[in-house]
Amino acid sequence: MRKIIHIDMDCYFAAVEMRDFPQYRGKPLAVGGSSDRRGVISTCNYEARAFGVRSAMASAYALKLCPNLILVPGRMEVYKAVSQQIREIFSRYTSLIEPLSLDEAYLDVSDCSLYQGSATRIAEAIRSDIFKETGLTASAGVSPIKFVAKVASDLNKPNGQYVVSPDTLMHFVRALSLGKIPGVGKVTEEKLNALGLKTCADVQQVPQTLLTEHFGKFGAVLYERAHGRDERAIVSHRERKSVGVETTLPKDLHTREACLDVLSSLIPELNRRLGRSASGRRIHKLVVKLKFDDFRQTTIESRAEEPSVRLFESLLSQAFVRAEGRGIRLVGIAAGLVCRSEAEQEGSAQLALSL
């Protein structure tokens, strides 16, 4: 069986800030946007979490929960540089590394001969190296399969690790709450519970067709996970499937025209990102996202052989109808990408949106 490690840095952005600015240590701290500019929390330390502050929470609400919260803007270039340090540490142990974000990654150490091939000891060594060289702590999950390693990395936080051996894998999976499986959000979990399914053991007692009937393709994935199966390989180089840009607004917008003005302001940045990261691919769809003042959101998309600003405007107009009187707090646009054929690559490689 494979030996998979999932490394997850502990409250990463906040930890970097506490490392670089010791005066923040021991105090509730969050990294995010300003509360007077409709900001959102990116991450927070454990002192802030004790007050109920969480990632993706509105900064203004976080300050209500924790009036003494220290709120600092993010320093993305610093976080990226430290993340690169961490990935260099990973590369000492394996070349099979799948970064999921700046602060987490999967590693396949099946062929690593260090520490007599013990994945447990390799995970300990990686975490030790990270702390010695960056001053930051990491947690780890070790398992023969990817999703269990990810779940396990959260069980002994912060600065710990949890091992699910091949012998204990099925026992661990059977007892696992379905809400712990990556991809199962609150709404999906509620639907599963309504079907009488709360744990993987429950899913093991029903036919796959029940899940696919209610959840489509994801139902088949869920069935596999609940039976302790996850054959996904480590993906070292992941092609981006979309490029997007969005902005949280200082004040809610209540007219379509105001939203269209914001959309127009996002186009130059989207073009810049497309030019930087979409080489060898072409646009095949455009997407507009709106988030409302109750934090619910909607997206609408359309196939686009000849993408244009006018199509974005049409999509936004359709999405705006769904506001039903609610204010708009965020506007986002994105372009879905697919690989070009050789013939297409010999022709124009222009990805900029036409006006």
Swiss-Prot record:
Catalytic activity: DNA(n) + a 2'-deoxyribonucleoside 5'-triphosphate = DNA(n+1) + diphosphate
Gene Ontology, cellular component aspect: cytosol
Single GO MF descriptor: damaged DNA binding
GO annotation (BP), single: DNA-templated DNA replication
Cofactors: Mg(2+)
Keyword Nucleotidyltransferase included in the entry's annotation: yes
Site (Substrate discrimination): 13
Active site location: 104
Chain ranges of the UmuC domain: 4-185
Cofactor-binding details, from the entry: Binds 2 magnesium ions per subunit.
Main enzyme class: transferase
InterPro entries, per the entry: DNA/RNA_pol_sf (IPR043502), DNA_pol_Y-fam_lit_finger_sf (IPR036775), DNA_pol_Y-fam_little_finger (IPR017961), DNA_polymerase-Y (IPR050116), DNApol_IV (IPR022880), IMS_HHH_1 (IPR053848), Rev_trsase/Diguanyl_cyclase (IPR043128), UmuC (IPR001126)
Keyword entries, A-Z: Cytoplasm, DNA damage, DNA repair, DNA replication, DNA-binding, DNA-directed DNA polymerase, Magnesium, Metal-binding, Mutator protein, Nucleotidyltransferase, Transferase
Annotated Mg(2+) binding sites: 8, 103
Record's subcellular location: Cytoplasm
Gene3D superfamilies per the UniProt record, alphabetical: 3.30.70.270, 3.40.1170.60, 5' to 3' exonuclease, C-terminal subdomain, DNA polymerase, Y-family, little finger domain
Domain of life: Bacteria
Pfam families membership: IMS, IMS_C, IMS_HHH_1
Family, similarity comment: Belongs to the DNA polymerase type-Y family.
Job of this protein: Poorly processive, error-prone DNA polymerase involved in untargeted mutagenesis. Copies undamaged DNA at stalled replication forks, which arise in vivo from mismatched or misaligned primer ends. These misaligned primers can be extended by PolIV. Exhibits no 3'-5' exonuclease (proofreading) activity. May be involved in translesional synthesis, in conjunction with the beta clamp from PolIII.
NCBIfam families associated with the record: PRK02406.1
Subunit relationships: Monomer.
Protein name: DNA polymerase IV
